[in-house]
């Protein structure tokens, strides 16, 4: 009986791992997912200060050719962020129906207006608020920060 149970569990594990390997995001979706992670996810960060925004925007390569005017960093575990993709679909700003909403801890970084590329300056605002992200793929992963 114990051997059968062990074999059944091993078979279930093998099938699960195979299934996960078969449903990886496409190359394009994976690139968009990696870009989303680079631009918007900082699970370890506390954020909230102007210096945080100045450093992170430069570190994440959003200030080299021009100063990105606005960006949001999400301070949640990636699995919490990915779980937003499991919520009901809502319209995105562009009209597509692949957006989802959730409440997360964020730091919004807004460019001050007196910035120049390579020396961009930001004002920070930390909050817990509703965000909307676009998700794609099977399984769905976040690919765009909508609002």
Curated annotation (Swiss-Prot):
Enzyme Commission number, as recorded: 3.1.27.-
In terms of InterPro entries, this protein maps to: RNaseA, RNaseA-like_dom_sf, RNaseA_AS, RNaseA_domain
Q: Where does dUMP bind?
A: 35, 40, 68, 71-72, 145
GO terms assigned for molecular function = endonuclease activity; nucleic acid binding; RNA nuclease activity
Which GO terms of type biological process are on file?
antibacterial humoral response; cellular response to starvation; defense response to Gram-positive bacterium
UniProt keywords (A-Z) are: Antibiotic, Antimicrobial, Disulfide bond, Endonuclease, Hydrolase, Nuclease, Pyrrolidone carboxylic acid, Secreted, Signal
> Pyrrolidone carboxylic acid-modified residues are where?
29
Bilayer-spanning residue ranges: none
PROSITE patterns named among the record's database cross-references: RNASE_PANCREATIC
Q: Which GO terms describe its cellular component?
A: extracellular region; extracellular space
- Where is this protein found? Secreted
Q: List the disulfide bonds.
A: 53-109, 67-120, 85-135, 92-99
One of the Pfam families matching this protein, by short name: RnaseA
According to its UniProt record, which residues of this chain constitute the active site?
40, 144
Per the database entry, which stretches of residues form a coiled coil?
Answer: none
Enzyme's top EC category? hydrolase
Does the keyword field hold Repeat? no
Q: Where is the signal peptide?
A: 1-28
Q: What does this protein do?
A: Cleaves preferentially after uridine bases. Has antimicrobial activity against uropathogenic E.coli (UPEC). Probably contributes to urinary tract sterility.
Please name the PANTHER family in this protein's record. Answer: RIBONUCLEASE, RIBONUCLEASE 4
According to its UniProt record, which protein family does this protein belong to? Belongs to the pancreatic ribonuclease family.
Name used for this protein in its record = Ribonuclease 4
Q: What is the lineage of its organism?
A: Eukaryota, Metazoa, Chordata, Craniata, Vertebrata
Q: Which gene encodes it?
A: Rnase4
